[in-house]
Amino acid sequence: MSDCRAQIVTTYAGWTVLSALRSGAPVKSSSRVYPLLRSVDFHRLLAPSRARIMLGEFAEWHRDATRRLCARERALCVGWAAKMVNVYLKTAGYVGGLGRPGLAQLLHPPIDAGLWSGLKREFADRPELLAKTHVVTQIKAIRDYATYETIIAGCREAADDLGCLLIELEQLWEGADYGPQPNFSFQRAAPRVARLRR
């Protein structure tokens, strides 16, 4: 991948974070968001490398990046900081294809009302799963990393049930104005991933 393409992808990833923070976020201006993003060592994950990233390394990196954002900007709680990290990585790592081998399999979906709504609809018959994913239902209520990890643990179960990557739970995302339909698909709606029955 050319340096130019990587620059375009990461610049766009920063803009998607800024865009995702427009509604309800305690930090919304580019003069605050972009410096915060520059303080995160995304390069460690996104730089071309043959070294595969493993779950333990990613989990430690994610926890540290989230906590550092919170320490750097007092208005951020863990929920908003994690959303910033996750939106950036979704755009750069999953959509943009940047990153070390194995990164896409580890990425977390951005947690927000649209994802909570889609999870609730898709897993209405799984109260034990929803007890994890919906331990809180507002981003600002994710005040500590343990709560965030509980939500992600439930999301992992949901992804396993759907037979998809954790980040691919985004297929369930429901926009405020669009309801449970494909996310601005340019093609005919594809069937959702079939759920495995246990």
Residues of each region from the PLM?
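Phosphate/adenylate-binding glycine loop and adjacent helical scaffold
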Residues: 1-75
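C-terminal accessory module of base-excision DNA glycosylases/AP lyases that mediates lesion recognition
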Residues: 1-19, 24-28, 73-86, 90-91, ...
